[in-house]
Curated annotation (Swiss-Prot):
Belongs to the MQO family. Pfam families: Mqo. This is Probable malate:quinone oxidoreductase. GO terms for biological process: tricarboxylic acid cycle. Keywords: FAD, Flavoprotein, Oxidoreductase, Tricarboxylic acid cycle. Its cofactor is FAD. Its EC number is 1.1.5.4. InterPro entries: FAD/NAD-bd_sf, MQO. The lineage of its organism: Bacteria, Bacillati, Cyanobacteriota, Cyanophyceae, Synechococcales. It is an enzyme of class 1 (oxidoreductase). It catalyses: (S)-malate + a quinone = a quinol + oxaloacetate.
Amino acid sequence: MTSSKNPTNDNSYFDAVLVGAGIMSSTLALLISEVLPDIKFLIIEKLKAPGSESTGAFNNAGTGHAANCELNYTPLDEKGNLKIDKALSINRSFERSMSLWASLYESGKIDIKKFLKFIPHISFVSGQDNISFLKKRFQKMTDNPEFIDMEFSTSFDEISSWAPLITKDRNPSTQIAATRIGRGTDINFEALTKEYLSLVSLNKNVEIRYKTELVDLKKIDKKQWELEISSEGRKTSIRTGYVFLGAGGKTINYLQKSKIPEAKSYGGFPVSGKWLICEKKDLTEKHNSKVYGKADIGSPPMSVPHLDTRWIDNKKLLLYGPFAGFTTKFLKQSSYFDLFSSIKKNNIFSMLDVGFKNNDLINYLISQSLKNHNSRVDNLKNMMPSANPSDWYLKNAGQRVQIIKKTEGGGSLKFGTEIVNSSDGSLSALLGASPGASTAVSIMVEVLEKSVLLLNDKHNLQKKINDLIYPELSDSENKSIYIKDIKKRNNSIFGFHP
């Protein structure tokens, strides 16, 4: 059945068009299909398969960001006070993602074994100042039900039992500390995307076109957009009432083409990445955790090193990094002109201002780009002293485009994700990077709620969303019980026993 919004059954008209077939678009597609099954919508993807760019298993950290171990989510303010608001927000958002997966798994719609593994998340530091910071973080975070199961240790032997490769060949007299949460996860977002789209494709009102690229878009009247798309050299036009731009780093270029006023203040700063990877079974079997360190003072947030157990294509691997670099491409499979084509009269000064203000980032990217294999392994040895260069090889990770936003003082470089909505709710775009994928459900619920798709029956549709996943947590006296109930329910469905 086609939507009533398209009474002419025009094959070139869709109620919604989603650009990109990564974790963001597929999450939105899943929500639309579950909550608004009669909506006729189209997903277009430039590549020949879903989840092949930023969502690709090797192209993102796959950490299952829950702020369990990422120390950059709990910074110190100017007075030395620990700020955990961001960590709490990320953790709650990730639990909503877990709730959706639990609901879909319980109803037999997806197979969690294809994308989710439970694995401890560990924060590891050395040196007295860092140990004091980690202890302060532990004490403040465990006051909250989200992190009540966190453990803290300064015992060399106990930390060795948690992560033996971290302590092997390390001087036992070294001052070290670690926190551990057993209920961490490794998420293969590429596999999850494919699960979502396999489910969505069962809806006869949904069409997915691969090897199809957005060329241009423009608003043709108050209720419609016209999109020019290209598939294997053949250009066609389609019309829609709603557009979602979820094309990774390339989104900034598409957003600018839309010419909505809200797009004028944005630019993008591309950053590339590389992993050190180990496949040796005698090492992969000894490390069963994700271990995050602490960035050096003055280093950008993206410089936080981590040694991760990952399962990719049914194979257990160790990944260390990511090592950053600079490129003018916004996607791995796109053009070196991406950055230059994104420079406009309304953002050039903010982009130049960001360049002048962020010498530390520029220097960091240059130094990272100049590293050779041995120097990268030397970096790894700070976390894994026994690392041997011959056990590791280098692999390109994904591109990320950090947000540049115009401010009164010039420009600001933002680390995170941001939704840009047109004033009439007919277009949404997702910009930025981490912790994106892990919080995709909360982000896409927000996108859907602000879109024209929910205008006619917002209350009932929001109820449908909350029946599918737990609602956003609000401050209440029963916060502790609420969070415990959600985790208990999700653990039971997933078969996780703390």
